Each structure stands twice: as C-alpha cells, then as structure tokens.
Amino acid sequence: MSPKTTKKIAILTSGGDAPGMNATLVYLTRYATSSEIEVFFVKNGYYGLYHDELVPAHQLDLSNSLFSAGTVIGSKRFVEFKELKVREQAAQNLKKRQIDYLVVIGGDGSYMGAKLLSELGVNCYCLPGTIDNDINSSEFTIGFLTALESIKVNVQAVYHTTKSHERVAIVEVMGRHCGDLAIFGALATNADFVVTPSNKMDLKQLESAVKKILQHQNHCVVIVSENIYGFDGYPSLTAIKQHFDANNMKCNLVSLGHTQRGFAPTSLELVQISLMAQHTINLIGQNKVNQVIGNKANVPVNYDFDQAFNMPPVDRSALIAVINKNII
C-alpha cells in the first residue's frame, strides 16, 4: 500500500444551530479543497462522531447552503460524550479513517468536547458557532449578527403596534446566560431600556423603570434576556404582564424564541465566516493544531485551548448604562 499523502479533515457542527453554520461548511470545504485537503462531514455532531457517521463532503450538495440557516449535517445533544470510553471510540473512528484534523463548529460545550479529544491525540480546531455570543475568544460568534438582525426586524414590527395602542411591550430574546443579544438588540432598535443577567430587575424595579419612560411618552419597549423572569425567585413574564395590566399599563409579551436562529446569514456574517474559514485552513497547512479560531475587529485570530478558556467576558456595563440612561 502506498503511503498516505493527502491530508484529511472532518468537520462537525455541535450544540444549538446558528445562522452561518452552513456557510462555514461551504467556505471550509472550498478552501480545504483548493489546498488539496480531503474533506469529510460528521453528521449529528459528537453523536455522529461516536457512531461513525462520516461521509465524504462531495456526497452532500452544498450549492444552496451558503445563504441558508441551520446545519445541513445536523446536530444532536449527546451527554454521553463526557464519558472517556465514548470519546476514545470517537477518536478511534477518526483514526481508522486516517483523518488528520477535526474541525468543530459550536459553542463552549462543543469546545470542551474538542479539548478533551485533543487530550486523546486528535488534532482539533474550533470555530465559534452560537447566536449567544458567549465565546470570549471571539468578538462576535457565528450566528450572532444574524440573530441580531432578526431581533431588529421583529422589534421594529412590535414597535409600531405598541405605539399605536399606547402599550408596554416586553420582548424576550435568547442568549442563554449572556446578555449580548439583548444589549446589542436594544442599541439597534432604540429600545427604552434593557434587562440582562448583569442588571436584573425585580417587579418593583421593572415597574418603576416603565413608569419613568411613560412620564415622557405613551408607550414603552423593553428588551429582556431569557432565563431571568420565571427563575431564581423572579416573577414570570406572564405574572408581570398581569400585574401591569391590572395597574393600567397594558402590556404585550413577545418571545422571539427560535426565530432568532432562522434568518439567512447577513453579509458581514458571511465575510467574517469566510475569513475565519480561510484562517483555519492556513493553520492546518502550518500544522498548528488544537487552536480556537475567532475574530477581533473583523480580523481572524487564534488561541490555544487554555488561552481561550481563560479569557474573561467583555464588560458591557457601559453599554447598558447608555441604553438605560432614561430610567436611572
């Protein structure tokens, strides 16, 4: 048998889907192929890696995927990947196919899975795929800017009816435990104030803030992060609405939910993805392994796992103060 000369990479998407994941597959495949690297896709994330669900990239038609949301290769929750024997089988599946490098597109849990695989000798690269923007090694994550656009579009629609009927609108956005979607969404839509995990408001504080806004105008639009109301002793949004309605502040609740994952990636999103994908393939060409790729000021950057995991989150208190200046 002749010795293997062509490098092989496997790519998987993991965690919650994010707009731009498909575009990342497209760009990685394009740049890898032009560098004479053979590409495989792993279906259904780490679940598929364990179950050996690898297919050559040329078997999937990506021609309509650049502008589509979701992930055409799937993503499944797979808590069993925490078990060493499961990861060992996943690593063995890569080894038997002579895969040289694994590229993981996902959030912080996906990154940890890659780090654990790297400890078993798998050469890994991670790209930040999550709408939550909670990967500290990247200024913006893949999907965040597009989710932000979906918030802008939906809040714009909510604003018109809220103003027409002189109401209070509470718009809940995603973000898990990161407030960036709420903060940047509030900035993009000129919302009256914002509530995030770093500036939580109880019912009394929320009511006081709304009343301050209503002193100057007949409507109020509030953007709140998910996982605040209805948790840790805070009233549910339904209870808040009932309280406001009973106190002559008619309230509409709008939870944007998974619509934030469903928009086609924006132009800037695609530009950043293209640059990060090219950077990833360049790192593979240099055999600089076990790297976390991100972007800073629209320039691709890379760090090793320990560097990336030890980066602190960005302090958004100044931005929150700007948004909430009328309720302070």
From Swiss-Prot:
Its main location: cytoplasm. Catalyzes the phosphorylation of D-fructose 6-phosphate to fructose 1,6-bisphosphate by ATP, the first committing step of glycolysis. The active site is at 132 (proton acceptor). Pfam families: PFK. ATP binds at residues 16, 77-78, 107-110. Gene3D superfamilies: 3.40.50.450, Phosphofructokinase domain. The gene is pfkA. It comes from Mycoplasma pneumoniae (strain ATCC 29342 / M129 / Subtype 1). The keyword Kinase applies. Substrate binds at residues 130-132, 167, 174-176, 226, 258-261. One of its GO terms (cellular component) is 6-phosphofructokinase complex. NCBIfam families: PRK03202.1 (NF002872). The lineage of its organism: Bacteria, Bacillati, Mycoplasmatota, Mycoplasmoidales, Mycoplasmoidaceae. Keywords: ATP-binding, Cytoplasm, Glycolysis, Kinase, Magnesium, Metal-binding, Nucleotide-binding, Transferase. This is Probable ATP-dependent 6-phosphofructokinase. GO terms for biological process: canonical glycolysis; fructose 1,6-bisphosphate metabolic process; fructose 6-phosphate metabolic process.
